[in-house]
């Protein structure tokens, strides 16, 4: 017997996490999307589409489908069967939250199939616990800029509207860097000085973003917790962190675990000089890739039902 539920689409954005000192706690939403088209039917069917997903499973072991079952598990229900078509614009293993977009889209889709038994805060908690940190899933779910923590008591967050005129320029190199490899190079312990530096700059960055103090971004985005250790894995990163402001960037950071690098820019001005500089850095380091400008996505994950 077929399900009476209507088909629907879930669209979850990419994200850029850390933004320098906000390690595992601060991120923003980028308008590149993972899209699921879900059609309730008598049996489960998973259909990855496009070249980015050519190597992903076309069955219930697919990460998106497994994410859908997480919603059912949290709700104490069985996931209704459906055909799930998956497409993504988010480059994989580049530090733009491809796994978080897939996870959030899947949990939201599973929740939708079940009739929305989970509220947004529970969806956030499910996804943050699955990822192990909330800095990508929170902006993917809510859009904008999000400060979030994950602990035994739950997942807590504050969403910030993007400051007026703040845009992002991303350099996406044509090589992959796994999060596990990027985490493996980090030290097990940090000095008191580096800890204080991280705390103070993360707090300043959150406050600057909340109040639209674009003039403080370059200083607030300084970081000694992860970028200095990951720089050898991303040719040209140190150059960009030190010099991007000379070419119009308001601040620069490794995006998530990399290798993508994010620069903030003022949308009222031209980014041509910054683009030229970033392409020069890639050329100097024997890399190829793309440089793109984006606004910060404000909507987060969106569900649309067929009419």
Curated annotation (Swiss-Prot):
GO MF annotation, one: ATP binding
Places the protein is found: Cytoplasm
UniProt key word Flavoprotein: no
Pathway: Amino-acid biosynthesis; L-threonine biosynthesis; L-threonine from L-aspartate: step 4/5
Transmembrane segments: none
Cross-referenced PROSITE patterns: GHMP_KINASES_ATP
One GO location term (cellular component): cytoplasm
Binding site for ATP: 91-101
Pfam families with a match to the protein in the record: GHMP_kinases_C (PF08544), GHMP_kinases_N (PF00288)
Domain of life: Bacteria
Enzyme class per UniProt: transferase
Keyword Endoplasmic reticulum recorded: no
EC number(s) from the headed UniProt entry: 2.7.1.39
Record keywords: Amino-acid biosynthesis, ATP-binding, Cytoplasm, Kinase, Nucleotide-binding, Threonine biosynthesis, Transferase
GO annotation, biological process: threonine biosynthetic process
Catalytic activity of the protein: L-homoserine + ATP = O-phospho-L-homoserine + ADP + H(+)
Main location: cytoplasm
Function comment: Catalyzes the ATP-dependent phosphorylation of L-homoserine to L-homoserine phosphate.
Family note: Belongs to the GHMP kinase family. Homoserine kinase subfamily.
Name of the protein in question: Homoserine kinase
Originating organism: Deinococcus radiodurans (strain ATCC 13939 / DSM 20539 / JCM 16871 / CCUG 27074 / LMG 4051 / NBRC 15346 / NCIMB 9279 / VKM B-1422 / R1)
Origin organism lineage: Bacteria, Thermotogati, Deinococcota, Deinococci, Deinococcales
Gene: thrB
